[in-house]
């Protein structure tokens, strides 16, 4: 298939874009197109006026019947329609679970004010069903509240519900308890996997049904699966998911999204295929044309930036390149979704990882060099896209919300500390097992195992030698309280010196994020997998502590006997200090330049991981998570104590 011809210089692309920027046009208008030799490009009448978009919003459109559809006639190229009117999707991604609920409205208003008409979001299974059969749609996970807020603001919604979402999340958004059974095959019609999917759908989809367009809601489309073409191991899986959604009452447009080279293996019959890409080029739509020549083009993810990994560089993308690409989408009548409009944060242990020869964890920030920053600030990309969208609009865009000021608080100097070994008694009852048990198979959390955090394996030994263990992702090895080495994917052996007396062998293993892409997800069990041996003799009789770092643990930890912080301390420990936020807390960023590796907890809430290898050097702290005046700050530092924790009003990513 040839690429689209260049737009004729006598035809104004802005005029063309004005015709198709139509989620808000007045009812009754349906522009016509002449048939082009290349079906991708239709010519609008050069004198076609711009239109007022105010009558086709979720609040204004009362009489609904047909929803978002596709149309292909001999008079023009294929296009989307909404309630019979020609429609072009200007979408932007915001993940409700990566943004404090108190800031949802602000981010959605900024999306609307930029000129977008649609918000898209993934729905993470692992967060909504953290334990098998235990569902959570409350607080920051209140999907319905987010969708209804979008409607109230005047935005349509494209919902991308998990099973698998990728999205740089731990295990691609799949619950870790699925890894308990080695016979369960992820993203297939394997009986055990399908049973879990069915139960999840039985709780999720009834919440989505009343939010659909034809139920007077804002949801105009639902994604069936995410990038299955890159995974495709079961030809019956996609048709199964398609039917599962229809059977439960999803009536809006269904779609799939895949990389441009994986559309053929990722699409399924009866579902619109969309693509994900970084830039347009000659062969962008070749595979898409092969599977659906008579359907409109939809770019489900246009990557305006990229994610970062620990030890890698910070990724940025030029704003002019983004502006040019989006103007090309408009020129060629391509519906699109900007990924990400606002990335937010991988708070807590939410981050995923990549595996391309080695395991690399995703950083805490999901800034993504997006249209809005991690803290919701405007960027050059925002200003350029807003100007572009205004140029094709018949009416002024909404006024942009004002940015609240950031704060620089006094440095926090921890005054108390608690070595990890003194905190063990405040953890839940340890597991005692003959052999090591991997994180997912620990008999805790109502049989769902441990999803995130760290796990400590303890065993008394009386002789040294060659220690061997498979630890995922990284393990610190101690004799009593003294660290003697590190185990990881590339280093499975360690020499233990000869012992005069029996000592405690302690292996502290951290999950740095499960891989979120590729078939590697099937093998992402964490902790120690397999046996632990010294001189090829397997060890037996382990005490296993789970360090999930939940808020309930920090509530218990407050009653511990903390000690004054020494000048220097090596080894894992908790450090406690106070952040003084004054009477009106504001957003800030915490700088931990003189600390090494660990996690920050504010009033028991996990902000995420810090690591001195970068690229990320600051952690975003939302002001809405701070109390007036005094706030408890606890660091779990794995290596060596630092001095103070500085507050700054600018991030270093």
Swiss-Prot record:
Name the UniProt record assigns to this protein: Beta-galactosidase-1-like protein 3
Keyword RNA-binding: no
GO cellular component annotations of the record: vacuole
Biological-process GO terms, alphabetical: galactose catabolic process
Enzyme class, UniProt record, top EC level: hydrolase
Family designation: Belongs to the glycosyl hydrolase 35 family.
UniProt-recorded Gene Ontology molecular function terms: beta-galactosidase activity
PANTHER family tied to this protein: BETA-GALACTOSIDASE RELATED
Keyword Transcription: no
Its EC number(s): 3.2.1.-
Pfam families registered for this protein in UniProt: BetaGal_ABD_1 (PF21317), BetaGal_gal-bd (PF21467), Glyco_hydro_35 (PF01301)
Domain of life: Eukaryota
InterPro entries on file: B-gal_1-like, BetaGal1-like_ABD1, BetaGal_gal-bd, Galactose-bd-like_sf, Gly_Hdrlase_35_cat, Glycoside_Hdrlase_35, Glycoside_hydrolase_SF
Keywords: Glycosidase, Hydrolase
Catalytic residues (UniProt): 227 (proton donor), 301 (nucleophile)
Organism: Homo sapiens
